[in-house]
């Protein structure tokens, strides 16, 4: 804060300030109870698959999803594929990593997610772009309202697993 000038910056736990978003290769996500909660009862498996319905089926549409953690309308999201600009589209969808790290784990352990952990609502800060190829590398640049820049060179195909996102 400097007089009436207020600035802030999001910092995720266990990461540095430059980790402002996470990317998902939709072609590599098939979210079923068999994949992520294999020990869940049939009713829990059904509940999980209902909650994860947007991610349940395989896709070859070449969409990449970008979860921008502290997004507001003053941010800029820029994506290029082989030098060609792709237009990010803001979508309303559940975060797939949240589904597998919270809901699937609880169902797999024989309990239901609490309302604090269950992804009952969609996320309002996920964008998607449609790539032309399943194996292209995307250059992603996110700039917050204060000019702080975060980048990723997303090599595809990119596997979807909890371990992949711990890196």
Regions found by a protein language model. Name each.
Residues 1-167:
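Metal-dependent phosphoesterase/phosphodiesterase active-site architecture
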């Amino acid at each position: 804060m400097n007089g009436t000038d207020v600035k802030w910056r999001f910092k995720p736990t266990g990461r540095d300030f430059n980790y402002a978003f996470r990317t998902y290769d939709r072609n590599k996500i098939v979210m079923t109870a068999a994949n992520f909660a294999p020990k869940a009862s049939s009713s829990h498996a059904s509940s999980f698959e209902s909650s994860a319905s947007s991610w349940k089926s395989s896709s070859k549409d070449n969409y990449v999803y970008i979860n921008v953690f502290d997004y507001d309308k003053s941010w800029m999201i820029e994506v290029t594929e082989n030098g060609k600009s792709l237009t990010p589209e803001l979508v309303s969808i559940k975060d797939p990593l949240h589904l597998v790290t919270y809901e699937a784990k609880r169902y797999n352990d024989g309990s239901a997610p609490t309302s604090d952990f269950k992804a009952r609502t969609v996320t309002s800060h996920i964008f998607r772009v449609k790539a032309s190829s399943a194996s292209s590398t995307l250059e992603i640049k996110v700039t917050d309202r204060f000019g702080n820049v975060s980048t990723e060179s997303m090599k595809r195909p990119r596997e979807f697993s909890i371990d992949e996102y711990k890196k």
